[in-house]
Each structure stands twice: as structure tokens, then as C-alpha cells.
């Protein structure tokens, strides 16, 4: 009888571990990007910071932060290219806005708009390295989400062509900020 009870507890524990670890890139019921099937990764807001960038275009200015899972972060830290399979990089993009409260404080020594902070969220872009699953796109799967909704197929068809100029850096734009 004790053996049966132990076996039932062990089976339940294994089933619980599998259920908790199965969704590697998000929950099964979440939206996935067309073409690549990439989902928003669970826990990405707890990942390590890789880089902070600013994008200035005719459409406006964005502040951007790139975070990576442990595999991607270690590759950046070690300067390892190409990135190993399992690397995931998430780029978070916001509008850049002037900080009225900071600028009031800085107004004496530094008049004018001197301090800028993140404004509204623009989008999130995700790169997942799996050289077997994505051989036609340099080993990377891509996703572009606005809110929790992926962009359409036409948008996702532009991902790899956009990244092709960065081929010498394994198709990744972000430089590591040590």
C-alpha cells in the first residue's frame, strides 16, 4: 500500500513539473507570430539587460531596451558568435518623452529639455535562435507584437531582410552594454 501511495505521489510530482516547464516560449493559448510561430516568452521582464538604445527617425524617437535569456546573455558576455540555439532576445520599444519633473529640477544649471524618459509602449520584438527550425532566416525566428497581438504576415516577412545587413553579427543589431 505504501508503495502505491509513493508511486502516485511521484507520478503527480513529475506531471506537475512537466506542466510548469512545458511552455518554453509562452502559454499555448497565447498568440504566436505568423511564419515563425514565436510567442511572448514567460518571465522576459526578469531577464538580464543586454543593451539600451535610442532610435531617431523621421517618424520620431524611441528608447529601446534589449533583454536576453541566460543563454543569450552568456553569449553576449563571452562575445560568442554565432549565438547558440536556445538564445532569446527581446527588444522593448517606447516613445521618448521629455520629463517635465526632471527638467524642473535641472532647469537652473541645465535650462531646457535635458531629461527624457520612456513614454508609451510602441512594440516588442523577439528573436529566438533555433538553427534547425529556422534555417532559411539565419537560424532565427522573429516576432513583432503590439500589446499582446502579433503583427501580420506582411510585417513578419520584413524581419529577416531587415536583419540581413547584420549577418557578420549573427543578424543581431544590439551591442552588449557591459
Q: Can you name each region flagged by the protein language model?
A:
Residues 1-5:
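Positively charged n-region of N-terminal signal peptides that target proteins for export
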Residues 8-21:
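Bacterial N-terminal signal peptides
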Residues 26, 30-33, 37-61, 80-178:
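Sequence context surrounding c-type heme c attachment/ligation sites in exported
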Residues 63-79, 109-110:
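N-terminal post-signal-peptidase region of extra-cytosolic proteins
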Amino acid at each position: 500500500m505504501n508503495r502505491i501511495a509513493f508511486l502516485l505521489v511521484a507520478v503527480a510530482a513529475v506531471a506537475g513539473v512537466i506542466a510548469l516547464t512545458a511552455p518554453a516560449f509562452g502559454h499555448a493559448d497565447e498568440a504566436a507570430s505568423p511564419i515563425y510561430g514565436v510567442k511572448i516568452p514567460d518571465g522576459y521582464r526578469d531577464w538580464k539587460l543586454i543593451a539600451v538604445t535610442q532610435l531617431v527617425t523621421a517618424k520620431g524617437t524611441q528608447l529601446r531596451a534589449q533583454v536576453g535569456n541566460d543563454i543569450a546573455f552568456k553569449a553576449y558576455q563571452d562575445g560568442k558568435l554565432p549565438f547558440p540555439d536556445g538564445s532569446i532576445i527581446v527588444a522593448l520599444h517606447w516613445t521618448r518623452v521629455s520629463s517635465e519633473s526632471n527638467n524642473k529640477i535641472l532647469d537652473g544649471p541645465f535650462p531646457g529639455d535635458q531629461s527624457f524618459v520612456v513614454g508609451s509602449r510602441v512594440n516588442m520584438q523577439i528573436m529566438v535562435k533555433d538553427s534547425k527550425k529556422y534555417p532559411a532566416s539565419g537560424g532565427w525566428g522573429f516576432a513583432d507584437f503590439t500589446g499582446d497581438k502579433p503583427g501580420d504576415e506582411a510585417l513578419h516577412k520584413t524581419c529577416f531582410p531587415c536583419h540581413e545587413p547584420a549577418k557578420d553579427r549573427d543578424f543581431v543589431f544590439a551591442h552588449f552594454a557591459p
